[in-house]
C-alpha cells in the first residue's frame, strides 16, 4: 500500500561526488548540493510531510526523469534523496531495518523538466 508520493523537480546531485575538502581535512558537501537540499526540503514541506517520521519497514521507489543522455550515478542520487528524506523527517532513518527495498527506474523524457518521483509504500 502506498503511504506517500513526492515529486522533486530538477536533477538530483550526488552528495558523495560533490564534496569540498577543507584545510582542516574535513570534507563538506558542495554549495550546489547544499542549495539543492534546502530547496528540495521546501518542496517536500509544500507537498506535505507525514508526522511522525515513518519507522516501519518500507519500500521506496525512485523514478528519475532525465532530459538528456548524460551519464549519472543513480546510486549516489538515491543516497542524496534518502539523506533528504531522513533530514526532512519523512523517514526516521535510512538503515536496512526501515528501508527494506529500494528500486530505481531512469527514463529519458522530452516532454517535461528533469525530476524524480519518490513513492514510499509498506514493505
Name every feature range the model reports, one short phrase each.
Residues 1-123:
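Acidic, proline/glycine-enriched N-terminal capping motif
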Amino acid at each position: 500500500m502506498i503511504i506517500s508520493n513526492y515529486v522533486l523537480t530538477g536533477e538530483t546531485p550526488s552528495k558523495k561526488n560533490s564534496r569540498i575538502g577543507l584545510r582542516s581535512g574535513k570534507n563538506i558537501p558542495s554549495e550546489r548540493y547544499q542549495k539543492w537540499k534546502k530547496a528540495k526540503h521546501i518542496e517536500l514541506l509544500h507537498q506535505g510531510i507525514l508526522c511522525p517520521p515513518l519507522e516501519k519497514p518500507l519500500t521506496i521507489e525512485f523514478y528519475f526523469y532525465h532530459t538528456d543522455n548524460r551519464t549519472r550515478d543513480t546510486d549516489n542520487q538515491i543516497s542524496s534523496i534518502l539523506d533528504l528524506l531522513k533530514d526532512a523527517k519523512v523517514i526516521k532513518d535510512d538503515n536496512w531495518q526501515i528501508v527494506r527495498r529500494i528500486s530505481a527506474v531512469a527514463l529519458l523524457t522530452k516532454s517535461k523538466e528533469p525530476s524524480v518521483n519518490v513513492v514510499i509504500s509498506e514493505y
